[in-house]
Structures are given as structure tokens and as C-alpha cells.
């Protein structure tokens, strides 16, 4: 097994273990108003993609209440150290790459439109992180509460409003995205057991909507091939679950598992393909980036 494939398998095994325990690593009992993307304590930058569920999983597994992380050397550079005997957590450096396709003579290969064919791949490297709770002697600022989102509900409503996707409320028990009509259909807000449940469901369905041909053009949404019970359908649901979790974290809304019944199908696709969770988390991040970018445009126009 090559180095990259071994990392893919390590990550997949972590996610599978969590799912088998009935604890998807993207579902966390967050407090209202508290954004909890894991961040690097030294740089202040948030971790993205597959590192988000990996670090959420480690925090839950080990009881860490702080979402700040750093490397062994960063702890020393900050004037502290990692306590003896502490175990590190897995994280991944994932660098998308592209390269022109060449024929046997070294000449570029063109596609049907005459443009050079490009092969997409990624450089994947494992690195290890420690939670600040595993360290001593660090600056007090590393342990200060993370600033809360001022208005979680308004943040979620802005994502809905600027997405451009019509949201229709009906007195029913189902929530879904209707690709052919490009609409989201939800029960009325008062039918949900909490405001957080309503918004996490809304953000789940809006993540599906980003797959429309006019947006990110995801196969599961545009091809019609995703049918309940097949792998493409399960993969799209995994993308939407992660997308909802990431958006809830951004808005400071407690996350919630939308479809516990899908756990078995997620386990199946992960056991068959150790890159499936990387694709799903990458698609979820792209969906979140697209939705959040729409909320920024009106602000730029009014500035």
C-alpha cells in the first residue's frame, strides 16, 4: 500500500469507527451562538475539509472542550509544551493538483473541444496535532472563549435569502430538495422541535441545491442517476450532512444528524471506497463556499 493510500485508509477507518458507534463525527452538541470550526491556535486559521470531522471526532472522543489545535513545534514556539504521554490526533494536508495529459510522444492530448486534457489528483500528507488542553505553559489567549456569532438565526436566514433558491413551507413531515423545479420544500418552522433543528434541516437541503446545473453541477443532482438506496444517492446525502454541519458551525447553530437511517449506506460506501469521505467533504466545502459567497456579494455592493 502506497503512502497516500495508507492515509486515505487511516482517515476512513476513523470515520467508520465513529459511524459504527452511532456517533457521526460531524454532529456535535454545540451551544447556540458558538462557532466551533477547529482552528490553529498559533495562526488563528480555521481547518477545512476532511480535517473538520477528524478534529471534531478527536475532540469528542477525548473530551476536549477547546477547538484550538497546534503542532508539537508550535506549542514550543509559543512558549509552552505538550505534556508527556499525550497522544496526537490525525490531520491531513490535502493539496489538489492538476497536470496536462501527454501521449506516448510527450505531446499534449486534446479533448473533444480541442483543449488540453488535464488530469486532476492530490498530494496527501499526514501530520499530527495536539489540542491546547494537552499542553501547558501556553499563552492565556489560547484558552479564551471564542467570540460568538452575534445573530445565528439571522446568519442562517441570510444564507437562505441570498442562495436564490425558493424555499416553500408545507404542513407535512418531509423536507427535500426538488431538482427539476429547483426548490426546497420544508415543514413549517413550528413543526420542528427546535429552531436549531429547523435551520440545520434548511441548510442540509440548501447544500443539495448547490448541486444544480446553474451552480456547482454535481452529478448526483443533475444526472438523475441518484436513486434511493444506491451509492450515488448515499454519497450525495453524506455531502449534504457535512455541508449542513459546516454551515451550522459557521452560523453558531447546534448541529443535528438529519438522517440516521443513512448510516448503514454511508458505512457501505466508505468500506468500499477509502476516498469517498474525501470527495464528500470536498464537495461539502465547495457547497458552503458557494453559499457563503452569495451572502458576501450584497455587502460588497452596499459598501
Regions found by a protein language model. Give the residues of each.
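N-terminal accessory/interface modules of nucleic-acid-binding and processing proteins
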Residues: 1-303
Amino acid at each position: 500500500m502506497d503512502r497516500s493510500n495508507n492515509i486515505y485508509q487511516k482517515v476512513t477507518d476513523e470515520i467508520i469507527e465513529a459511524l459504527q458507534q452511532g456517533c457521526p463525527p460531524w454532529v456535535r452538541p454545540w451551544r447556540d451562538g458558538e462557532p466551533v470550526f477547529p482552528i490553529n491556535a498559533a495562526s488563528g486559521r480555521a481547518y477545512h475539509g476532511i480535517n473538520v470531522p477528524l478534529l471534531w471526532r478527536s475532540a469528542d472522543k477525548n473530551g476536549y472542550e477547546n477547538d484550538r489545535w497546534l503542532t508539537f513545534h508550535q506549542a514550543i514556539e509559543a512558549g509552552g509544551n505538550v505534556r508527556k504521554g499525550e497522544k496526537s490526533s490525525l490531520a491531513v494536508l490535502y493539496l489538489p493538483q492538476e497536470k496536462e495529459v501527454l501521449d506516448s510522444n510527450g505531446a499534449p492530448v486534446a479533448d473533444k473541444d480541442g483543449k488540453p486534457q488535464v488530469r486532476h489528483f492530490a498530494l496527501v500528507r499526514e501530520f499530527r496535532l495536539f489540542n491546547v488542553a494537552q499542553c501547558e505553559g501556553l499563552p492565556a489567549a489560547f484558552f479564551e472563549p471564542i467570540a460568538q456569532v452575534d445573530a445565528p438565526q439571522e446568519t442562517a436566514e441570510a444564507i437562505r435569502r441570498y442562495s436564490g433558491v425558493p424555499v416553500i413551507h408545507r404542513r407535512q413531515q418531509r423536507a427535500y430538495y426538488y431538482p427539476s423545479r429547483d426548490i426546497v420544500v420544508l415543514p413549517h418552522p413550528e413543526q420542528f422541535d427546535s429552531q436549531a433543528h429547523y435551520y440545520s434541516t434548511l441548510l442540509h437541503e440548501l447544500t443539495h441545491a448547490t448541486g444544480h446545473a446553474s451552480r456547482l453541477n454535481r452529478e448526483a443532482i443533475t444526472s438523475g442517476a441518484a436513486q434511493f438506496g444506491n451509492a450515488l444517492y448515499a454519497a450525495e446525502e453524506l455531502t449534504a450532512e457535512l455541508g449542513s454541519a459546516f454551515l451550522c458551525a459557521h452560523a453558531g447553530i447546534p448541529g443535528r444528524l438529519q438522517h440516521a437511517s443513512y448510516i448503514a449506506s454511508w458505512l457501505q460506501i466508505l468500506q468500499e471506497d477509502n476516498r469517498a469521505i474525501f470527495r464528500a467533504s470536498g464537495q461539502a466545502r465547495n457547497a458552503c463556499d458557494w453559499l457563503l459567497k452569495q451572502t458576501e456579494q450584497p455587502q460588497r455592493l452596499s459598501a
